[in-house]
UniProtKB/Swiss-Prot annotation:
Keywords: Ribonucleoprotein, Ribosomal protein, RNA-binding, rRNA-binding. This is Small ribosomal subunit protein bS6. It comes from the Bacteria. GO terms for molecular function: small ribosomal subunit rRNA binding; structural constituent of ribosome. Residues 104-129 have a biased composition (Basic and acidic residues). NCBIfam families: S6 (TIGR00166). One of its GO terms (cellular component) is cytosolic small ribosomal subunit. Binds together with bS18 to 16S ribosomal RNA. The gene is rpsF. GO terms for biological process: translation. Pfam families: Ribosomal_S6. It comes from Vibrio parahaemolyticus serotype O3:K6 (strain RIMD 2210633). Belongs to the bacterial ribosomal protein bS6 family. InterPro entries: Ribosomal_bS6 (IPR000529), Ribosomal_bS6_CS (IPR020815), Ribosomal_bS6_sf (IPR035980), Ribosomal_S6_plastid/chlpt (IPR020814), Transl_elong_EF1B/ribsomal_bS6 (IPR014717).
Amino acid sequence: MRHYEIVFMVHPDQSEQVAGMIERYTGSITEAGGKIHRLEDWGRRQLAYPINKLHKAHYVLMNVEADQAVIDELETAFRFNDAVLRNMIMRTKAAITEQSIMLKQKEERAPRREERSEAKPEAKSEAAE
């Protein structure tokens, strides 16, 4: 079995269906004896350029170990699913299990957002006095 990195982008109006899509795709990989080393849902992100007049998409990253037949099946599923805007499947030399840079950046920004949201109510209460 070979190692692959898979990234696919889903239409932003179909974001609520992403969990089901991930479950379906990971299920087909594990049923065929493959392994999922990393699965990251990056959420809705701004696109670098418009695709089909869309400026945002829902991103998902998977690092898997699977046979070529499973990857061909996944590629066909991506092609016939209208909600998938783009996909990229790359073969890697080894399994990648650490967090991606995108997810690390997202987690670094999360505490700052919480700090700002906590500071706003305090500022409003001071202004009311």
